[in-house]
Amino acid sequence: MSFSIWFEHLSTIKNDEIKKQITKAISAHGMWKVRLKDAINKQSSEFEVNHVRTPHHCELGKWLNSEKASLLKFPDYSKVFDLHAKVHEEPARIMQLALAGKKDEASHALGLGSSFANLSAHLTQAMMHWKQAL
């Protein structure tokens, strides 16, 4: 196998792995709406606000940070990285409201048209764009 064919094959494998990670991340981040609704209803959560706020605690954040050197070459990486960090601020704020018993305010912050909904949608769109570009 020539070097160029081998390199192309290696690149395809890497792209397939990135696609899998993106798919997992979209699913995992989608679960946060469920977790937040649960926290609002119960006024408790297994997650601490500061843990939720920190982007490198979740699987996507761990992957984005651990593979940064190899992922920087992708134009969509920086956008996803930045949006991901911003997205973590909103669930932390909502979690804080939920744990403080501010159910109506927390529910509103989670609803359609909220910062959480908009940032989540932008992050998902950016990840899908990245996946399609591979």
Q: Language-model segments: which ranges?
A:
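N-terminal membrane-sensor/transducer module of prokaryotic signaling receptors
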Residues: 1-134
